[in-house]
Amino acid sequence: MKTDVIVVGAGLFGSIAAKALAQAGLAVVGVDDSRPGAGSLPAACLMKPSWFSSMGKDKFEPSLELLDRIYGVKDISFKVGLLRATVHWCDPAQILGDEEVPVYREKVTALTRTSSGWAVSLEGREAALEARSVVVAAGVWTSELVRSQALGGLVGRAGVAFRWQDMQLEEQFISPWAPYRQTVGFNISPTEVWVGDGSAIKPENWNQDRQNVSYSRCAQAIDRAGFGDQEAGRVKALYGIRPYIAGVKPCLLEEVEPGLWALTGGAKNGTISAGWAASELVRRIK
């Protein structure tokens, strides 16, 4: 099969890039092996201006424009201490559940340069997929397929968020609990509440005790501590490993070889970074 662009990775970065390229008129397919621990799993896709203002207007304005055009950006009012703040939001279910771009749910085993672009070999499939361009947006696993000096600094940070079923908050909130960390709670759907505490732990140090501490902090923030919600199956833990690259902002977008792109490293600003990267790919892949 031949196409214009193959996007490896169907998390936030890959999904947003694939949809933007498809809407720009390119033929796009995705590949994702549904690996446990993907960084997008706990994502809420909240974008508070103070979190991303250091990107600069030249990056966050094109990002917000693209995200609003292809998904619709909503504004949510949060209580922040004694003040209120408006936070931009895209529904992660809409991004990750979009079906405009077909996705092969298989593992990539090799990327091979061809005379007309790139061949992507898939596990258990004899014929490779072929495209003029390949974007590898595989989070912390991007370096398994792409070599780049910048990817040498790629590390993962584990964290968890929680979704309470059959519940709504009267007041959506952002509350600091430690330097550079905040507990955030909001109504992510008409029947669910999302709460996260910003934990960012080395994956090898993550364990059930860490998750229990995070759960306790989140449950206390919404006055659900001691109600037995976990035992009753009323709350779901969403674990993921976010990709970080020190000194790279807002993320890594690099054409490592002609037609082969590495895209990762969004850290805690994944959605706004993904929007910028997608706008750049639309501009640079013809």
Swiss-Prot record:
A GO molecular-function annotation: lyase activity
Pfam families: DAO
Purpose of the protein: Catalyzes the cleavage of the N-Calpha bond of glycine in Nalpha-GlyT to produce 5-aminomethyl-2'-deoxyuridine (5-NmdU) on DNA as a step in the pathway leading to thymidine hypermodifications in the viral genome. As a final result of the pathway of hypermodification, 5-acetylaminomethyl-2'-deoxyuridine (5-AcNmdU) substitutes for a subset of thymidines in the viral DNA. These modifications probably prevent degradation of viral genome by the host restriction-modification antiviral defense system.
GO BP term (any one): symbiont-mediated suppression of host innate immune response
Swiss-Prot/TrEMBL keywords: Host-virus interaction, Inhibition of host innate immune response by virus, Lyase, Restriction-modification system evasion by virus, Viral immunoevasion
Catalytic activity line of the entry: 5-N(alpha)-glycyl-dTMP in DNA + A + H2O = 5-aminomethyl-dUMP in DNA + glyoxylate + AH2
Protein name per Swiss-Prot or TrEMBL: Flavin-dependent lyase
Entries under InterPro entries matching the protein: FAD-dep_OxRdtase, FAD/NAD-bd_sf
